[in-house]
UniProtKB/Swiss-Prot annotation:
Its cofactor is Mg(2+). The gene is mraY. It is a multi-pass membrane protein. GO terms for biological process: cell division; cell wall organization; peptidoglycan biosynthetic process; regulation of cell shape. This is Phospho-N-acetylmuramoyl-pentapeptide-transferase. GO terms for molecular function: metal ion binding; phospho-N-acetylmuramoyl-pentapeptide-transferase activity; UDP-N-acetylmuramoyl-L-alanyl-D-glutamyl-meso-2,6-diaminopimelyl-D-alanyl-D-alanine:undecaprenyl-phosphate transferase activity. It is found in: Cell membrane. The keyword Glycoprotein does not apply. It catalyses: UDP-N-acetyl-alpha-D-muramoyl-L-alanyl-gamma-D-glutamyl-meso-2,6-diaminopimeloyl-D-alanyl-D-alanine + di-trans,octa-cis-undecaprenyl phosphate = di-trans,octa-cis-undecaprenyl diphospho-N-acetyl-alpha-D-muramoyl-L-alanyl-D-glutamyl-meso-2,6-diaminopimeloyl-D-alanyl-D-alanine + UMP. Belongs to the glycosyltransferase 4 family. MraY subfamily. Its main location: membrane. Its EC number is 2.7.8.13.
Length: 366
């Protein structure tokens, strides 16, 4: 419990104190966000706001997790688990991809960045490496960081993604991992369009996963082989990472809340999407994450619906996509949209945890 708290506290402090340093530096260098001409008119005043604040978020996550690991080594002698390293590596890899995208935007002075092909290749390579590694490193109980089964609250034993011959099964599994990583990283990226929206929603999701992973740690099959135990590798490390993500997002939100002094950029949004994806896979809650992170799902779905509708019928379903811009164009104030989306995110997160806990109660009663 101490390590989980320390991870969040350190991440918050690093993020909240590093972010203003970045604001001053980027402002002095004239490195500010460009705003799309086709975007909401109210956003034009944000032109020039420093971006790449995701650097502070990433720094918070890294230092928060590493300090918590160090505390564990000193107090209990327990070293870090491989699951934590793999999810952290995924987060940093996507953060690096986002950094490259942000850097190109700032150098060119246009709201463009890496082309779609470059992003696709970057996410694909990252997903393949992550997918291959999570099936390695079995612990003393034979548990690996990931499995080839689709999961809801835990693995669904009857739904193995890697069906067929070994090579075919592995290809299917890697495609699935790519879709999970690409979907969540792009969904968080699309949500990052209003002051405090993505950082606030991600904080809510991370807070929920602190509870989920802590409960998995307390009821791990490695500790007590009870009926409802969780066959998750390194749940304490995953809880520390979720806590670090929560703390880093809250520290950044202090400066990113309306009116935002800095944006996280793709550096932050792609990294946080990677953290969400990594936690969903390693905690065996891939389908549950859809409920917990429903705001991200709605934001991404609104873009897909808009594009498909326009190409098929020539008509738009929404005034503008992602959907948060639709409500802005209907006359909602930006802060109203953000707060209402936070409320919906909190309700979804509570519902998700309720489903998770109810499943445990049902299993523990037998």
């Amino acid at each position: 419990m101490l390590q989980i708290f320390i991870a969040g506290a350190v991440a918050f402090l690093v993020s909240v104190f590093l972010t203003p340093v970045l604001i001053r530096w980027f402002s002095a260098e004239g490195l500010g966000q460009e705003i799309r001409e086709e975007g909401p008119k109210s956003h034009f005043k944000k032109r020039g706001t420093p971006t790449m604040g995701g650097i502070a978020v990433l720094a918070g996550i890294v230092f928060g997790y590493l300090i918590a690991v160090l505390v564990g080594l000193v107090t209990t002698g327990a070293g870090p688990g491989v699951s934590g390293w793999l999810v952290l590596g995924l987060t940093l890899a996507l953060g690096g991809l986002g950094f490259a995208d942000d850097y190109i935007k700032l150098v060119k002075g246009r709201n463009l960045g890496l082309n779609a092909k470059a992003k696709l290749v970057g996410q694909l390579v990252t997903a393949i490496v992550f997918g291959l590694l999570i099936l390695q490193f079995p612990n003393a109980h034979g548990l690996t960081p990931g499995s080839t089964h689709l999961s809801f609250v835990r693995d669904i034993a009857t739904f193995d993604i890697a069906i067929g011959p070994a090579i075919v099964g592995m290809i299917l599994f890697l495609i699935f991992i790519y879709l999970v990583i690409s979907a969540w990283s792009n969904a968080v990226n699309l949500t990052d369009g209003l002051d405090g929206l993505a950082s606030g929603v991600t904080a809510i999701v991370m807070g929920t996963y602190v509870l989920i992973t802590f409960w998995q740690f307390r009821n791990s099959c490695a500790v007590s082989a009870q009926a409802a135990c969780y066959a998750v590798r390194d749940p304490l490390d995953l809880s520390m990472l979720a806590s670090a993500g929560l703390g880093a997002c809250l520290g950044f939100l202090w400066w990113n809340a309306a009116p935002a002094k800095i944006f996280m950029g793709d550096t932050g949004s792609l990294a946080l999407g990677g953290l969400v994806a990594g936690l969903s896979v390693t905690t065996q809650t891939e389908l549950l994450m859809i409920l917990v992170g429903i705001i991200f799902v709605i934001e991404a779905a609104s873009v897909v619906i808009q594009v498909v509708s326009f190409k098929a019928t020539g008509k738009r379903v929404f005034r503008m996509a992602p959907i948060h811009h639709h409500f802005e164009n209907k006359g909602w104030a930006e802060t109203t949209v953000v707060i209402r989306f936070w409320l919906l995110a909190a309700l979804a997160a509570m519902s998700g945890f309720a489903v998770f806990y109810a499943e445990w109660l049902n299993g523990a009663s037998f």
